[in-house]
């Protein structure tokens, strides 16, 4: 019996050891300082600030007003709100706050990914064209220097950039507090660490900046539950890594209750598995063919939910083996 369990446990344990060493080693590069960088604060780039909102009348006005207070020339950026299948006053409140509002109604293609794809197409048809788009959630607040930091990164040639995801409400409940801590940790031991050693980070759904050249050339096309992860991997296949802007800060609202956090995590996990199933093979082939460590590292990013599953499976196998061992010992002792 133990031989069969060994056949299961040894590969599992080897994988767990590999990922543990990987995460442990990677974290050190995010704990001890940051990669030196020269910042370019000469305002050169133009931005389309896009907010996809579904029934967000309670918060959309505050975000639009906040975006108009950024430390960046007003004529270099415009604020667009996509009122996506809204049944409340989101569009009206956004207009009153000064945003350019587009209303979208589509019962067949629902979700943020579809709304973004729809809005990008309209951006490209406008007379005014922008150097980059920045995407936010309706419940966000944005640091005044956000666009200055993104402008600096774009001027240095970066094309796909994720900003620092801070917490808007860490003290509201213990759930929001735990979420906030997890994001603070991940920002340093994952995103910053990867940026410091030249690996690709990952888009986080909000606070992200995308060069319009990328969108024109490759399209958006990311419409699954985790459209940010999907586009990250799509871009990586095209040789475009995601960089990390540690000083471009966005304050994101975290879940307040256990059920809110559960539903959010479940949605993220479903989307993560979906993207992993579609992109791991493609990334592996490209990474091996080109001997590209950045692309191969993207596989580890996608493998995270499987790693958690392996931990659960390992615990289950150990528990079963322990119970069976006790039963066998009991039978031998009293035989």
What positions do the PLM features span?
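N-proximal low-complexity "stem/linker" segments adjacent to membrane-targeting elements
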Residues: 1-65
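Acidic helix N-cap motif at the loop->helix transition within catalytic regions
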Residues: 61, 88-95, 103, 145
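Short beta-strand-to-loop acidic/aromatic patch adjacent to the donor-nucleotide binding site
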Residues: 127-141
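Long helical/loop segments within the catalytic core of UDP-sugar-dependent glycosyltransferases
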Residues: 105, 109-128, 144-225, 266, ...
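A conserved acidic beta->alpha catalytic loop
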Residues: 83-91, 106-108, 141
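Cell-envelope/extracellular polymer assembly enzymes that use nucleotide-activated donors
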Residues: 45-48, 78, 230
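Short, acidic, metal-binding catalytic loop of nucleotide-sugar glycosyltransferases
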Residues: 65-76
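Basic/Trp-rich segment in TM-proximal cytosolic loops or flexible interdomain/linker regions
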Residues: 1-9, 13, 30-41, 197-199, ...
């Amino acid at each position: 019996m133990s031989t069969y369990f060994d056949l299961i446990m040894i590969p599992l344990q080897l994988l767990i050891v590999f990922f543990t060493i990987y995460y442990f080693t990677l974290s050190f590069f995010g704990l001890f300082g940051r990669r030196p960088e020269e910042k370019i604060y000469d305002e050169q780039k133009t931005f389309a600030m896009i907010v996809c909102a579904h029934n967000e009348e309670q918060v959309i006005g505050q975000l639009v007003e906040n975006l108009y207070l950024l430390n960046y020339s007003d004529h270099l950026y415009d604020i667009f709100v996509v009122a996506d299948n809204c049944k409340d006053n989101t569009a009206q409140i956004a207009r009153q706050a000064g945003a350019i509002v587009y209303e979208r109604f589509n019962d067949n293609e629902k979700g943020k990914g579809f709304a973004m794809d729809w809005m990008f197409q309209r951006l490209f048809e406008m007379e005014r064209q922008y150097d980059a788009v920045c995407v936010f959630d309706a419940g966000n607040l944005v640091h005044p220097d956000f666009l200055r930091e993104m402008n600096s990164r774009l001027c240095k040639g970066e094309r796909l950039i994720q900003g620092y995801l801070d917490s808007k409400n860490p003290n509201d409940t213990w759930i929001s507090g735990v979420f906030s801590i997890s994001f603070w940790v991940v920002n340093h031991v994952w995103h910053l660490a990867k940026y410091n050693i030249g690996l690709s980070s990952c888009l986080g759904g909000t606070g992200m900046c995308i060069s319009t050249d990328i969108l024109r050339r490759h399209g958006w096309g990311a419409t699954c539950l985790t459209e940010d992860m999907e586009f990250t991997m799509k871009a990586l296949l095209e040789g475009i890594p995601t960089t990390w802007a540690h000083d471009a800060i966005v304050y994101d609202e975290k879940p307040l209750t256990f059920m809110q956090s559960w539903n959010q995590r479940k949605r993220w996990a479903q989307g993560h598995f979906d993207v992993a199933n579609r992109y791991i093979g493609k990334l592996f082939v490209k990474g091996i063919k080109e001997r590209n460590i950045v692309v191969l590292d993207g596989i580890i990013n996608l493998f995270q939910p499987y790693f958690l599953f392996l931990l659960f499976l390992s615990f289950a196998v150990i528990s079963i083996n322990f119970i069976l061992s006790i039963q066998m010992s009991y039978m031998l002792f009293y035989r």
